[in-house]
Amino acid sequence: MSEKQTFADKKRKTVEQAEFTEDGRYLRKVRSFVLRTGRLSDYQRDMMNNNWANLGLDYQNTPFNFEQIFGNNNPVVLEIGFGMGRSLVEMAKQNPDRNYIGIEVHTPGVGACIAYALEKGVKNLRVICHDATEILRDAIADGSLGGLQLYFPDPWQKAKHHKRRIVQPEFITRVLTKLGDNGFIHFATDWENYAEHMLEVLRQFDKELRNTSATNDFIPRPDFRPLTKFEERAHRLGHGVWDLYFVKQA
């Protein structure tokens, strides 16, 4: 590859918008992710460069027009942190009556997801390489989502890093404004402490959200959620896996 940077190479450097204080100082943010230095393969780079117009969406500070993007009014499900994207593509393939948007900040995963979507002939999927909190804040219209999926997010195990966990009350508040009536929130994690944290946060919204668990905590592993590599690793390590499924009350 030449030293000239392509679209895919530049994408990694623009996963969040720079923000400044009123006096012009750079505003440091508490991020729920760390940009790993995994190598973007030539194949993944080509997938992004050649197919972004059809399968990719760029950050914008106005809401996406989903009907224009997908050509229909089917419900839109947003997945945050899709990793390499195989489970997201499989879910989109299994549910042609839904549209899916996946957000991932790591370009190798974005390239791999695009490649797998092309292999499977999936048309009802778009990917975004940007900070999910900024996408939710700026590019998703209120009441426009049919559901939000967050599978195996970084657990930030150390107590001093718990503030970096994406599942916080302010995050749920934002998500609630973006969900339509009866929209769902589906979380999964293989860290028990994070599962308990998620449940504690979601329970703060018991007037807005209904827990579908018969025991008012976690649901059995649903068949509709494809197995991810993180879940496979969890099983190998003897970890449990916890699913939470809440529905916005009309």
Swiss-Prot record:
Pathway: tRNA modification; N(7)-methylguanine-tRNA biosynthesis. It holds the Pfam family Methyltransf_4. Substrate binds at K158, D190, T228, K229, F230, E231. One of its GO terms (molecular function) is tRNA (guanine(46)-N7)-methyltransferase activity. Its EC number is 2.1.1.33. Belongs to the class I-like SAM-binding methyltransferase superfamily. TrmB family. Catalyzes the formation of N(7)-methylguanine at position 46 (m7G46) in tRNA. This is tRNA (guanine-N(7)-)-methyltransferase. It comes from Actinobacillus pleuropneumoniae serotype 5b (strain L20). The gene is trmB.
